[in-house]
Amino acid sequence: VTAGQGIRPAGRPGTQPAGVSRWADLGGPLHYLDFGGPADGPLIVCVHGLGGSAANWVAVAPLLTGGCRVLAPDLAGHGLTQSRGRGTGVAANRALLHRFLASVAPGPVILMGNSMGGMISLLEAGEHPGAVAGLILVDPALPFLAARPDPLVAAMFLLYLAPGVGRVVMAHERRLPSARRVAGVLRLCCVEPARVAADVITRHVEVLDQRARFTGTGQDSSAAIRSVVATVGCPGRLAYQRRIHSVACPVLLIHGTGDRLVPIAAARAAARANPAWTLAEITGVGHVPQLEAPVSTARAVAGWLSAAGAGAAGAAAARRH
């Protein structure tokens, strides 16, 4: 996919500032990164996945700010946003995202969500269509209908969900050095982890180092995992499927062909079931194309914003005036 006219990358990965930290009071402190961009450009709000953070967008966001304004919040129980009594499941974080949009980014925006963040973005677009001009779904968590994850990935999630066992496993992981934990996640989520830039890895390690000082992170993670699995599997998958079909805004679905968590077959099935969507496959990358292949991801976004997503871009830019 080539970059579209009017939306241009602002630079190469690793050459741009990794966003300015800001805070909003939304029933407690919420951290987000402001990557800048033109004040009159469409606003893209990036929503990370399960166990992720706003740092998941530091490689691709600078490539979008030539034509777009880009923000990325840390959801409750993720990144630097501690739960502080707020729920960390899908429904609670969907509601928190809506509050973020209303408070920090009022008016229709383009939501760009990865994995669980794609699920939350879909649910927000279905629940509050006036708030969402368009969706960019990057390997979103999809219902377990057309395809299931890699058996080893499924076994890992079952281990986390097992009463008592999951708590012990997560406690052990939290005692590991942050760099080792980040490396493990990249091995799971990428086809070639070495493609992820060193400064991007460092940013993720820094986030985990800060999270090591927080309390209650194990319970927060367990609640989030249970909620995601309940939404894509039984009993929630049919309700989630209906919500997906109710989305009326333009949608770009970006998916790595080597994704082990959400197989490419699931994305292809979703695209067939929703023929108005635009599917952009990125060959040979995994679950986090925005980290493993940020240039290809940015090109797919740019091309869509200048073509099928032009109406969404216009609506998300008009809100700025």
Annotate each predicted stretch with a short phrase.
Residues 247, 253-255, 259:
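Short beta-strand/loop motif that positions the catalytic acidic residue
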Residues 1-44, 65-68, 94-95, 99-101, ...:
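Alpha/beta-hydrolase fold catalytic core
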Residues 28, 33-82, 291:
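Conserved HGGG/HGGXW glycine-rich cap/lid loop of the alpha/beta-hydrolase fold
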Residues 275-321:
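Catalytic active-site module of serine/aspartate enzymes centered on a nucleophile-bearing elbow/loop
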Residues 126, 135-172:
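Flexible "cap/lid" loop of the alpha/beta hydrolase fold
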Residues 105-115:
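Alpha/beta-hydrolase fold nucleophile elbow
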